[in-house]
Amino acid sequence: MIKRKLFSELIDHLPQKEMSLIFGPRQAGKTALMEMPKTHLDQRGERTLFLNLDIEWDRPHFESQAAFLKKIELELGRKRGYVFIDEIQRKDDAGLFLKGVFDLKSPYKFILSGSGIFAQLYRQIQPRTMLCHQSQFEQNHQNRPNNYLLFAFS
C-alpha cells in the first residue's frame, strides 16, 4: 500500500482539538486511511476507540449524545483519547449530532470517515474546515482511476 500523504497530514493534525474528517466515494480507501493513525497511536500506547456505523453493535451508542459519550468514557476514561468513527454518513443528522458533541469540549479527538451524503455534514461545519486533497501521485497509482479522498479539519 502506498503510504498516503494524507496519513502524514492526519498525524500532524492529531494534537489539534478540531475534528478530522475523511470523505470520498465508496472503496476509495477511507477505512484503510483511518486504520493507519489508529495503529500509530496504539503503538505509542495512546487510548483509541474505533466505532463503525456499518457494525450493528456499534449503532446503539449513537442513539443520543449522552449514550455516545458514555461509551467513549467507559472505553477511554476521562483523559485525552482518540475516537475513530467510520461510516458516519449512516447517522441521521450526523452534523448536528457531532457539532453538539464537539461543543461539549470533551477531552477526545474525533477522526471521522464517510461517503455519499457525508458531504452534507461537511457543509454544516464548513466554516471551521480546511481541505487537503489526495495527491496527484497517489491518484495515478490507484487501481481505480476516479478515486479521491478529501481530508478536512473542522
Feature roles, as predicted:
Residues 1-154:
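Phosphate-binding site recognition
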